[in-house]
């Protein structure tokens, strides 16, 4: 019993121990599991952080185009850190001592400030005098661009009297190879001398001016200088110079002005096209200045408000600025010239301003002027000034070596035809980029990225000749006009050379397919331009040929035409106008004998004999007789009837009196542009009445007896009364008309008809007094039917004998005038036989004494219009 109890106790104890052990094991497993979970979490977090750091480190390494594993990233990081440690050690050796350089300034800024404070610039010269480097600060001191000095000899800028001394200094102070030590910055090899240097000018024709300067420097060997201390200096040396010297020794000096400049031009432009805005009053006082101005000019807005802009301008630019401002006041907007503005740091910066005037919105009065100022470099200013002076300045060959490697200089602007033509003209010689960077290059000794951007090429390469734009256009037009005479072949002749050159143009080494396709596109554009110009030239040629054909037709029409000379006396002076006859039968023209003007009968033979023989006395008597007879006959109106009639539509003007022709000119007092003069060319042989001129009002018409005739219609154009025109036999197509004397007659039409007939049978002089009485009665009856006409004064109708005397002397005394008259008139002297001529000469006095009413007919036969 007891054993049984004990056994049960023991079994219960064992069961309890097993359960406790199991529970303990379960607890331990739970603890281990929790530890593992926490450990895994921490490990995952650590791995994630490590991967993030590796990824970030890989992104900072160069050449991370492809995905790198962790070991590669770590290896490159180690290499970079090792190289950085070496560079840092070398930089510490060349670092400017901190005891005299402010900590907030970099080496680059400190060097620039030191050069400005010393009024100096850096210059690197080879032992033979070739300049291989010059700093930008030379512009503010000597007004030279760095590109003007680089690759030039220093002796070109030194007076001839100092050449020998400077050459001796450069050639005798050479460093030996054993003396080159790492302590090259020390002054044991320092060289110092003084000389004169040439100042730069905008106009090369100005007289030379030299500045006294001091050279302080050392001879340095580039082989002993650490690469990090080159500062990009090696990259600035021309490639043509690099193999030219074996020892790589040059003289690096600081050039200082002996006389310091207190105000200098700012030689560098940190950012291209920097600009700021300001507002000015009409008196040019500052009213507003934006936030971009202080970093450029140094002034805060409150420092300049209320001050005049002219206080900050250079004295040499005031005159040009005043002209620009006057232009602004006249036109309301404009652009100024380049001018210098004084900054707060006492430096001159070059600006160009675009301005316009704003007006008040209510009263439209000028309110203020808005200006936008742009900072420009001295290189742009000098180039613009030289273009104004007519000096062609070639573009600086900036970065020529780099452009040769990259092939970027072979690109053709597909928009500009001019540049494409220049490319084809100068295809063997590569050119530099047309636009160089305006970013300032600094002169520091530790920044390898600060290198100049304007380095010219070797001087052995001949520069491209630049012609003015108008000369290029003239040459191009002349070449086009010479080739366009053959319109059938001008197109192929212009385009085939371009196409063949495009086909044979090799692809330069290093040029991409895109660049070559750009060239082909430019050539195609050039071809289209040439074809379009060819079509325009062909159209111009066709138009000119058509005009030439019309001119030839007009010349044929006027060729061989005869001329008639008429003289009108409307004032005491003589006025002449041109009269032209159309081509017709010359025999009919030569048969015209008498001329009836204002009732006067003057035979043509008398005029011809008076012109050829020079009977001055007879001519004077003839003019006096004609004037007296004209005065007596102006009191009546007359009409003429014959077998055939001719009508002309010109309104009358009674002050006009035609006398015998002396010149081949005629003046018709008529302001109306639609007036016409009709002159018959032939007359019947057997006519019993002589035609006269009858003057009516504008609602009447005149009828004349005519035979077969040839009429020329001449459209007249008004000119001044004093104009005299003597047309030639080839180019005659107008009649010059003079304005009438009185304004009341300017709106009236005028009718004038001149007929020529064969001479009638002359009547004895004794019968004329007997016929005067019936003729006067007939005239009085005719005046009752016709309207009254105002009578001219005796002074207007009388021709001065002295004028006729001078005219006769002019005709008979000048052989060239007789030659011109003989060439202008197709009438031949053989037409009038000598006997017939003498017969008319003997009857001259009888014809002068006749009254103009001998040929009057019955007034009832006149048919009014």
From Swiss-Prot:
What task does this protein carry out?
Transcriptional activator which forms a core component of the circadian clock. The circadian clock, an internal time-keeping system, regulates various physiological processes through the generation of approximately 24 hour circadian rhythms in gene expression, which are translated into rhythms in metabolism and behavior. It is derived from the Latin roots 'circa' (about) and 'diem' (day) and acts as an important regulator of a wide array of physiological functions including metabolism, sleep, body temperature, blood pressure, endocrine, immune, cardiovascular, and renal function.
Residue ranges for the region (Interaction with SIRT1) are: 450-570
Q: Give the span(s) annotated as Implicated in the circadian rhythmicity.
A: 514-564
Query: Which parts of the sequence form the motif Nuclear localization signal?
Result: 32-47
Offer one example of a GO biological process linked to this entry.
proteasome-mediated ubiquitin-dependent protein catabolic process
Q: GO CC terms on record?
A: chromatoid body; CLOCK-BMAL transcription complex; cytosol; nucleus; transcription regulator complex
User: Polar residues compositional bias: what residue ranges?
Assistant: 447-463, 856-865
Where is it located? Cytoplasm; Nucleus; Cytoplasm, Cytosol
Q: Give the encoding gene's name.
A: Clock
Record protein name field:
Circadian locomoter output cycles protein kaput
Site: Important for interaction with BMAL1. Where? 84
Chain positions with Phosphothreonine modification: 451, 461
Q: Cross-link Glycyl lysine isopeptide (Lys-Gly) (interchain with G-Cter in SUMO1) - where?
A: 67, 861
């Amino acid at each position: 019993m007891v054993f049984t109890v004990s056994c049960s106790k023991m079994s219960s104890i064992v069961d309890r121990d097993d359960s406790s052990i199991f529970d303990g094991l379960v607890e331990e497993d739970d603890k281990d599991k929790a530890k593992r979970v926490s450990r895994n979490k921490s490990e995952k977090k650590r791995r994630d952080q490590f991967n993030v750091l590796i990824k970030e480190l890989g992104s900072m390494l160069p050449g991370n185009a492809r995905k790198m594993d962790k070991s590669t990233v770590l290896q490159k990081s180690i290499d970079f850190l090792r190289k950085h440690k070496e560079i840092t050690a070398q930089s510490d050796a060349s670092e400017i001592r901190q005891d005299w350089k402010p900590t907030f300034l970099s080496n680059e800024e400190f060097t620039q400030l030191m050069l400005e404070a010393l009024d100096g610039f850096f210059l690197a010269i080879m032992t033979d005098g070739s300049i291989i480097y010059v700093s930008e600060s030379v512009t503010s001191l000597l007004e030279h661009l760095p590109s003007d000095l680089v690759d030039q000899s220093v002796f070109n800028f030194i007076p001839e009297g100092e050449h020998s001394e400077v050459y001796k200094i450069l050639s005798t102070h050479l460093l030996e190879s054993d003396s080159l030590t790492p302590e090259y910055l020390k002054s044991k090899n320092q060289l110092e001398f003084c000389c004169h240097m040439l100042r730069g000018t905008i106009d090369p024709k100005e007289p030379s001016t030299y500045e006294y300067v001091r050279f302080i420097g050392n001879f340095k060997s580039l082989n002993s200088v650490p690469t990090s201390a080159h500062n990009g200096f090696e990259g600035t040396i021309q490639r043509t110079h690099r193999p030219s010297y074996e020892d790589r020794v040059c003289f690096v000096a600081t050039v200082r002005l002996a006389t310091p400049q207190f105000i200098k031009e700012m030689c560098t432009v940190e950012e291209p096209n920097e600009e700021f805005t300001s507002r000015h009053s009409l008196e040019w006082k500052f009213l507003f200045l934006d936030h971009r101005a202080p970093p450029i000019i140094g002034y805060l807005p409150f420092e300049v408000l209320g001050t005049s802009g002219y206080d900050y301008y250079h004295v040499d630019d005031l005159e040009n600025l005043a002209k620009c401002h006057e232009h602004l006041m006249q036109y309301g907007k404009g652009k100024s010239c380049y001018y210098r503005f004084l900054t707060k740091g006492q430096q001159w910066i070059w600006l160009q301003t675009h301005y316009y005037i704003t007006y008040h919105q209510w009263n439209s009065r000028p309110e203020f002027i808005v200006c936008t100022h742009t900072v420009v470099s001295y290189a742009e200013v000098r180039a613009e000034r030289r273009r104004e002076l007519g000096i062609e300045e070639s573009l600086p060959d900036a970065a020529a070596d780099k452009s040769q490697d990259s092939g970027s200089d072979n690109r053709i602007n597909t928009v500009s035809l001019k540049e494409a033509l220049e490319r084809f003209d100068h295809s063997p010689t590569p050119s530099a980029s047309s636009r160089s960077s305006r970013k300032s290059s600094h002169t520091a000794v530790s920044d390898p990225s600060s290198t100049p951007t304007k380095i010219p090429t070797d001087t052995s390469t001949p520069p491209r000749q630049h012609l003015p734009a108008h000369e290029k256009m003239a040459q191009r037009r002349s070449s086009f006009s010479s080739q366009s005479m053959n319109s059938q072949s001008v197109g192929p002749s212009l385009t085939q050379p371009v196409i063949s050159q495009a086909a044979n143009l090799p692809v330069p080494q290093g040029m991409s397919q895109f660049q070559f396709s750009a060239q082909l596109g430019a050539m195609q554009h050039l071809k289209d331009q040439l074809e379009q110009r060819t079509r325009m030239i062909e159209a111009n040629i066709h138009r000119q040929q058509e005009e030439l054909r019309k001119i030839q037709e007009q010349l044929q029409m006027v060729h061989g035409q005869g001329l008639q000379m008429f003289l009108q006396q409307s004032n005491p002076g003589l006025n002449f106008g041109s009269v032209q006859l159309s081509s017709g039968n010359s025999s009919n023209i030569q048969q015209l004998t008498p001329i009836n003007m204002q009732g006067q009968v003057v035979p043509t033979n008398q005029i011809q004999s008076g012109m050829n023989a020079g009977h001055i006395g007879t001519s004077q008597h003839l003019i006096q007789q004609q004037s007296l007879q004209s005065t007596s006959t102006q009191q009546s109106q007359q009409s003429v009837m014959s077998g055939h009639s001719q009508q002309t539509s010109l309104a009358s003007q009674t002050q006009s009196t035609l006398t015998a022709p002396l010149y081949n000119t005629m003046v018709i007092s008529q302001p109306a542009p639609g007036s016409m003069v009709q002159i018959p060319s032939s007359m019947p042989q057997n006519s019993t009445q002589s035609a006269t001129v009858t003057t009516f009002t504008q609602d009447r018409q005149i009828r004349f007896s005519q035979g077969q005739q040839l009429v020329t219609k001449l459209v007249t154009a008004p000119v001044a009364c004093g104009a005299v025109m003597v047309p030639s036999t080839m180019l005659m197509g107008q009649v010059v008309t003079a304005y009438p004397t009185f304004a009341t007659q300017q709106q009236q039409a005028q009718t004038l008809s001149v007929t020529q007939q064969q001479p009638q049978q002359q009547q004895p002089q004794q019968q004329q007094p007997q016929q005067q009485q019936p003729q006067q009665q007939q005239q009085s009856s005719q005046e009752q039917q016709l309207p009254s006409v105002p009578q001219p004064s005796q002074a207007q109708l009388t021709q001065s004998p002295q004028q006729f005397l001078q005219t006769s002397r002019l005709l008979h005394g000048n052989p060239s005038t007789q030659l011109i008259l003989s060439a202008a008139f197709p009438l031949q002297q053989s037409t009038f036989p000598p006997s017939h001529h003498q017969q008319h000469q003997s009857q001259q006095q009888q014809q002068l004494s006749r009254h103009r009413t001998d040929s009057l007919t019955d007034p009832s036969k006149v048919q009014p219009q």
